[in-house]
Amino acid sequence: MQGDTVKSTKAIDAFIKLLRSTISKSDNNEMYALANYNLGYIAFHRKDYTQASNYFQKYIQLEKGENTTALADAYNRIGDCHLHVRNFEEAKHYYSQAEQMNTPSGDYSFYQLALVSGLQKDYTGKITLLNRLVGKYPASPYAVNAIYEKGRSYVLMDNNNQAITSFKELLNKYPESPVSRKAAAEIGLLFYQKGDYNQAIEAYKQVIEKYPGSEEARLAMRDLKSIYVDLNRIDEFAALANAMPGHIRFDANEQDSLTYTAAEKIYMKGRMEEAKTSLNKYLQTFPEGAFSLNAHYYLCLIGSEQKNYDMILLHSGKLLEYPNNPFAEEALILRAEVQFNQQNTAEALASYKMLKEKATNVERRQLAETGILRCAFLLRDDVETIHAATDLLVEPKLSPELRNEALYYRAKAYTNQKAGKKAMDDYRELAKDTRNSYGAEAKYQVAQGLYDAKEYAAAEKELLNYIEQSTPHAYWLARSFVLLSDVYHATGKDLDARQYLLSLQQNYQGNDDIESMIESRLQKLKTEN
């Protein structure tokens, strides 16, 4: 093959040498003109467009005008040379010259003029020229392409309705043309882009039925698949694919994938009720499908969105049958929250413990530890509470609110476990800030601990300090007044005890057990004195 190419090249070079010899020996005669014409073609095929244009120009100057066909051809080739180097205005000039000679190649000139207008983005001008071409040369082999290019011009002008009309005209006039296959596919695509799915489906079906096995049919089936996925009508597509010519295979795995994809698209568009129906249908059809875990996960999210807690428990449970799946963490978060809010505390504790084991970041681990702490405290599991609080308190980015909560629950658990010193340490830490409810109670508990230890002076000092700094939590401040009266009674200062109780009785507005505490102590002081 390579040898043939070398021989051909040598033959052309010999021919060029002969032509140049002819030019050098002849002056302004027919042979001289023809030699320039042939040299122009050789340069053109070698893509030396500047040289080719020069030879054709020389031929036009030498040709006496008798051979109009060759002259028109030379003008066309000069136009082609300018087109190849994107010199559009010059190209149009020479194509116009060629067309005006009224030779059989005039349709080519017209067609090229139209294409150049398109390259200049003058789509209106291109359409006008194409219409004139079809009118002047109805039998032209370029007529088919002209109608197609007219349709493409309308597409580029965003005039899809006119584009569809042009493509349909092409299908009616030249149904067997390869260009008609492209036009038929374009019609389907334009309807698809307009969102006119039913028209697009019919157009694409015609492509597949009329041109089975073609590239256009393959692409039409691809777009049909996308349309049916968008419409969430996969069963229809399966039936259509199996009925279509061209040996189109649509196996169960692909139907599994497309059914899920269609449902997922509905979910992503925010159409929750429709997505729920579609995802449930997918799970019913493919209970062990490739995307069953994804479907259960999205149904969990829909359940959360719709506050359908039974739905969350059902689908999170299905997900946790495969504990190492990528959705397990989020499923546990949703599941544990529902269980906790429904006061299924032991179940919530188990879920939070699983979440802690699986947590892949600090935030989720902290969420799990917080859940474990709260569940353990509600279950009165002091040992679990102490461990959970201790784990939480070593977290590096713990918020002040969670830190206070952990210290408080641990202090309560230590108290229950008769670990008074450890409880007191946590209460003292909390008591540094009495603006929050935990600190307000803790300040009181520190004083109560001192009172219980009969350290009355220290208890009095603690309580007076509390009264001085105050707190927005009136109940614990009132309890501190009551405890201070107990301290004074224990140290023989019954008058002071009575004054604090009476003052509290007059000023405290709460509707709780403080009133009964005051009454019982005043009665006791009255009885003893």
Show the residue positions of the predicted features.
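Acidic, polar-rich low-complexity tracts and alpha-helical solenoid repeat scaffolds
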Residues: M1-N529
